[in-house]
């Protein structure tokens, strides 16, 4: 879908090359997912796994960023969200590359005979506590159905030796997630701390882990400048996706 041919619609988010409907998904398209999909390293990637795809946002972004020969498997537990992801994929330029699986990743992963160079997830991060408005939203937001230790273990079983496992998390939770990953034998290779503007402390962190040891590259990304417009660095990262950048 070209920019000139794109139509703004109310039930989702219009990007330059695709549209993501999310009205039947517990978690809507947001800055976290867009950041992660634009940031994850894709050089030499041959196969991608999206854990908890929701609306299919990350799978679609990564399909746009990678070669047409790269398959993307997107796994989603919630049947309603998975159906909407399938519809979003069907209307995108990449229906031949993205496969949406309606399944629990804990059941799906052990059945796989191939490994993935890139595994990506915008995971739940709240411990069970205050109830959400719907069971679907609770599932998407809370770790009861997929705790971080289980997620890290599944990724370890599915990844290639030199692959990357990428997540986005709130800053403090990301620090705890990193320590947990290191304790399980992962190596932190990329870290970007994200702040709303220069005056604020980082509120999100983008993390890339690998089974393979190596130098860790760290930086900071500010979303908005002092004029409240998107910063140059945020624009450079996401302009291939945002419709009016």
From Swiss-Prot:
Designated name of the protein: tRNA1(Val) (adenine(37)-N6)-methyltransferase
Task of the protein: Specifically methylates the adenine in position 37 of tRNA(1)(Val) (anticodon cmo5UAC).
GO cellular component: cytoplasm
Enzyme Commission number: 2.1.1.223
UniProt organism field: Salmonella typhi
Domain of life: Bacteria
Catalysed reaction equations from the record: adenosine(37) in tRNA1(Val) + S-adenosyl-L-methionine = N(6)-methyladenosine(37) in tRNA1(Val) + S-adenosyl-L-homocysteine + H(+)
Family to which the UniProt record says this protein belongs: Belongs to the methyltransferase superfamily. tRNA (adenine-N(6)-)-methyltransferase family.
Gene Ontology biological process terms in this record: methylation; tRNA processing
NCBIfam families: tRm6a37MtseTrmN
One example GO MF annotation: nucleic acid binding
Gene from which the chain derives: yfiC
């Amino acid at each position: 879908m070209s920019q000139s041919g794109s139509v703004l619609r109310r039930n989702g988010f219009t990007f330059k090359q695709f549209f993501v409907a999310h009205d039947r998904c517990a978690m809507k398209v947001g800055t976290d997912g867009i950041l992660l999909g634009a940031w994850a390293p894709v050089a030499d990637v041959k196969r991608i796994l999206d854990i908890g795809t929701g609306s299919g946002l990350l799978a679609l972004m990564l399909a746009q960023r990678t070669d047409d020969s790269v398959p993307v498997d997107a796994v989603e537990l919630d049947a309603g969200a998975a159906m909407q992801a399938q519809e979003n994929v069907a209307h995108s330029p990449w229906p031949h590359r993205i496969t949406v699986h309606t399944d629990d990743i804990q059941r799906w992963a052990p059945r796989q005979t191939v490994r993935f160079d890139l595994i990506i997830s915008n995971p739940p991060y709240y411990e069970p506590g205050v109830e959400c408005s719907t069971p679907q939203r609770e599932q998407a937001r809370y770790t009861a159905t997929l705790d971080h230790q289980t997620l890290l273990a599944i990724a370890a079983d599915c990844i290639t030796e030199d692959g990357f496992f990428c997540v986005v998390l709130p800053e403090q939770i990301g620090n705890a997630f990193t320590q947990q990953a290191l304790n399980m034998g992962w190596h932190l290779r990329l870290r970007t701390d994200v702040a709303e503007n220069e005056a604020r402390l980082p509120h999100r962190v983008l993390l890339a882990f690998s089974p393979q040891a190596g130098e860790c590259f760290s930086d900071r990304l500010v979303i908005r400048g002092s004029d409240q417009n998107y910063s140059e660095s945020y624009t450079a990262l996401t302009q291939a996706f945002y419709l009016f950048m």
